[in-house]
């Protein structure tokens, strides 16, 4: 059953009024593939626009806080923790991992996915002048904890 449709098939925000407040957490990832020299430029701090990882981290955090403004039926949430980690993975990619937490009545999967996605988009934006062929890929939920459905983790 699709939770965002009412009995007539119309889009509607899920009513979480009667749901218990529980600890919720979600982990998402994204990857940006690029030319090896682009990654070297980022790692050496030689990018003319500044620290690419720092800006992407802040963009991801800000995006998680604004998820309800971007995705129409998401609830506005009082997130208690947002972490966005970026690391070089091999010679030609950056792996982004976002973790969102709260004590609340609905999950934080969309916030974690939005954080990872916007961090990836920010890397693309900052580096497109030197590498227009970058590819954003592998945006996915890795893990979700809390709520009625409990713990879910992606299968390896």
Swiss-Prot record:
Keywords: Lyase, Molybdenum cofactor biosynthesis. GO terms for biological process: Mo-molybdopterin cofactor biosynthetic process. GO terms for molecular function: cyclic pyranopterin monophosphate synthase activity. Signal peptide: none annotated. Substrate binds at residues 73-75, 110-111. Pfam families: MoaC. Transmembrane segments: none annotated. CDD domains: MoaC_PE. Coiled coil: none annotated. Pathway: Cofactor biosynthesis; molybdopterin biosynthesis. Its EC number is 4.6.1.17. It catalyses: (8S)-3',8-cyclo-7,8-dihydroguanosine 5'-triphosphate = cyclic pyranopterin phosphate + diphosphate. Belongs to the MoaC family. Catalyzes the conversion of (8S)-3',8-cyclo-7,8-dihydroguanosine 5'-triphosphate to cyclic pyranopterin monophosphate (cPMP). Homohexamer; trimer of dimers. NCBIfam families: moaC (TIGR00581), PRK09364.1 (NF006870). This is Cyclic pyranopterin monophosphate synthase. It comes from Stutzerimonas stutzeri (strain A1501) (Pseudomonas stutzeri). The gene is moaC.
């Amino acid at each position: 059953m699709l939770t965002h449709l009412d009995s007539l098939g119309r889009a509607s925000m899920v009513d979480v009024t009667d749901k218990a407040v529980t600890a919720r957490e979600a982990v998402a990832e994204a990857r940006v593939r690029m030319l090896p020299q682009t990654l070297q430029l980022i790692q050496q701090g030689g990018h003319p626009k500044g620290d690419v990882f720092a800006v992407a981290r802040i963009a991801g955090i800000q995006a998680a806080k604004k998820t309800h403004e971007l995705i129409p039926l998401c609830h506005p949430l009082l997130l208690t923790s947002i972490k966005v980690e970026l690391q070089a993975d091999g010679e030609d990619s950056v792996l982004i991992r976002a973790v969102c937490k709260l004590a609340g009545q609905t999950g934080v999967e969309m916030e974690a996915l939005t954080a990872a996605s916007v961090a990836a988009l920010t890397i693309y934006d900052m580096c497109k002048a030197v590498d227009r062929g970058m590819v954003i890929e592998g945006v996915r939920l890795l893990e979700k904890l809390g709520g009625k459905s409990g713990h879910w983790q992606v299968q390896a």
